[in-house]
UniProtKB/Swiss-Prot annotation:
The lineage of its organism: Eukaryota, Viridiplantae, Streptophyta, Embryophyta, Tracheophyta. Residues 255-547 form the PI3K/PI4K catalytic domain. It holds the Pfam family ubiquitin. It is a peripheral membrane protein. Its main location: membrane. This is Phosphatidylinositol 4-kinase gamma 4. Residues 34-111, 112-190 form the Ubiquitin-like domain. Residues 430-456 are annotated as: Activation loop. The phosphorylation of phosphatidylinositol (PI) to PI4P is the first committed step in the generation of phosphatidylinositol 4,5-bisphosphate (PIP2), a precursor of the second messenger inositol 1,4,5-trisphosphate (InsP3). Undergoes autophosphorylation and phosphorylates serine/threonine residues of protein substrates. Phosphorylates RPN10 and UFD1 in vitro. It catalyses: a 1,2-diacyl-sn-glycero-3-phospho-(1D-myo-inositol) + ATP = a 1,2-diacyl-sn-glycero-3-phospho-(1D-myo-inositol 4-phosphate) + ADP + H(+). Residues 250-263 have a biased composition (Polar residues). It comes from Arabidopsis thaliana. Its EC number is 2.7.1.67.
Amino acid sequence: MSSAGVALSPVRSEPLIMPLVRANSCLDSYPDDTIMIYLTLPGSVIPMRVLESDSIESVKLRIQSYRGFVVRNQKLVFGGRELARSNSNMRDYGVSEGNILHLVLKLSDLQVLDVKTTCGKHCRFHVERGRNIGYVKKQISKKRGDFVDPDEQEILYEGEKLEDQSLINDICRNDDSVLHLLVRRSAKVRVKPVEKNFELSIVAPQAKDKKGREAKSIVPPKKLSLEPVVVNSKAKVPLVVKDMIQSASDGLKSGNSPVRSSEGTGGAYFMQGPSGNKFVGVFKPIDEEPMAENNPQGLPLSPNGEGLKKGTKVGEGALREVAAYILDHPKSGNKSMFGEEIGFAGVPPTAMIECLHPGFNHPKGIKTKIGSLQMFTENDGSCEDMGPLSFPVEEVHKISVLDIRLANADRHGGNILMTKDESGKLVLVPIDHGYCLPESFEDCTFEWLYWPQARKPYSAETQEYIRSLDAEEDIDLLKFHGWKMPAETAQTLRISTMLLKKGVERGLTAFEIGTIMCRETLSKKSLVEEMVEEAQEAVLPGTSEAAFLEALSDVMDYHLDHSQEH
């Protein structure tokens, strides 16, 4: 995951009414379209006056001014939908008087810990906010061999013992946080804030010689399991996927619990390997997706089953994550024939699994969870962390091909990781595909549209890859792996693949094709949506899918040729 994580930020419990400030306006009078909305965060409701005509960007700027949350770190959710278009206004999204909006914040995922003893010994290490107390114990002992064994440590907060699964992000919330580390030889840890970090001072008597320490084995929970979900026994599972699943399973058996990430609007867990020194995968349970029954981030249940993005359903994100990996064919051909090769866009290996562990969010009792497991990618951050000018053109193009094909409704810089290959070249890795393959094009969003690389022509190699794509083969391949796509979703894949191939035939760039798919504003339909409506009007009711696609092909040819003439 990137170095930036998404979390529901802790706030003061008292409400704060954010004033509506306009030039030449009186403090006791407001424009006619003024409304009162309520921003909710854990433990807090914040009344806020806005105008129905205010843009989403301007509302976020006011939140930044009064609460200090940077605009790019904010997500607003209303009525089960993310207010993702910055230039759209509150009225466009149907926000009116008295409505409740959920504010999700992205914070730094790294916490610097300074550990000191009264005898002058000191060490410093970085801890991800998604790490737990058990990990902190191991790091303290590992950094300083004369510290107490992790098994001999107990950490209390406000008089209550913290379990090893407790997250740093959930504990270090208040400026006056004090942690007491109780060891068999009675040690204490006091935490005080130092700017954005925490400083830990440890008081402990001289530790015993390592040889004199009592060896303790880690005893994992009695009930735990991690197995692949196999729908078709004939479907070949790539070796890299088998190894990932085995490593995650061995990690659980070794007592290395899942570590919940503070990133994202749904539940996501870092799965550790048997050594406990590195992550091997990221598990996203279906029942913890945004607006699902057991979502741990405080989002409400979906009122109609629709996901945060139009054309998606709650609980189908894991299927789409796996589908993106399966359909990311390598340059040499269909992934069903060459399962061991890396896909053209580089989607990390992903599989559907079932896992039982008490470390997940189980408000109604511990049960087996089904979800997607994606290989963890070591990275240097995400594309949000730096400007796009340094991104290689081919790296941006490969992601654009994937997003256009799958009609991705949630491509932003935060879900494109940056890493380097063996030669030191920058490589972009696309992740988070739970909102691809929607049933409509309404929410298609491609951040790379605004990057200069998108205006460059596709290389001959990329064009050849695009020509090799076949939507019907893709639909059959997903069915072979266990997902019989809904008719609307299959139609989206056929249309987006058709547009991509026709666009490349005419020499269109990623920017030009992507612009056809994405709406300029929330209320103005995209050109591809208009093409679909035109084709639907040209055929009789009850017409076959093949006849509709033939009509759409003619409509698409006309619009693409006409646009080139101008």
